Amino acid sequence: TLVVDPDGLEWSNLPTIDIDEITLLKPDKSARIIAPDYKDIIELINYRNGNLVLDDCRYYVRSRIEEGVRQLLVRRRQKDVDIFAVAHSLNEVPPTFWTFATHLVLFKIKDNPQRLKQNIPKYKELTEKHIPEINNHENHHYFRVIPL
């Protein structure tokens, strides 16, 4: 598993590597990259055979690098990579990511994803069923994995 951490404040249990070392990461090992430069994000397409966690995924999508991230999303299956785009809100998930999403792991949320209505698969089911049920659950850490 390779975790891309925008600020180094999370994932401190993992060793830190440089972006040019990702091809050396063995499938049974985990590591993190901290705050890669926008020009380095394209290097993530060299990662193979593992899980790629994009923590605070909004950080990686700016106009300068969107094509690099898109290439990463498009080629993920050919490179045997599962991508986990982590966000603190549905509204923080860039629209591009929804196109490639197969599942949503949803915890309690306070935001209203109305502006993403056209982007989120199964929007009606999500807003009418899953969000209310999850938010009303007594366990603060309750979550649901929703196939998209």
Label every model-predicted segment.
Residues 25, 96-98, 133-137:
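A general structural signal for short secondary-structure junctions and capping/turn motifs
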Residues 32, 104-106, 141-146:
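Ordered hydrophobic segments in well-structured contexts
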Residues 115-148:
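Phosphate-binding and hydrolysis-coupling loops of NTP-dependent motor/remodeling domains
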Residues 1-27:
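Walker A/P-loop NTP-binding active-site region of P-loop NTPases
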Residues 3-10, 36-126:
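Conserved P-loop NTPase motor cores
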Residues 1, 29-30, 49, 139-141:
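Short, surface-exposed beta-edge/turn micro-motifs
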Residues 19-46:
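Short glycine-rich substrate-engagement loop in P-loop NTPases that contacts/grips substrate
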Residues 18-21, 89, 147:
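Short, solvent-exposed coil/turn linker segments
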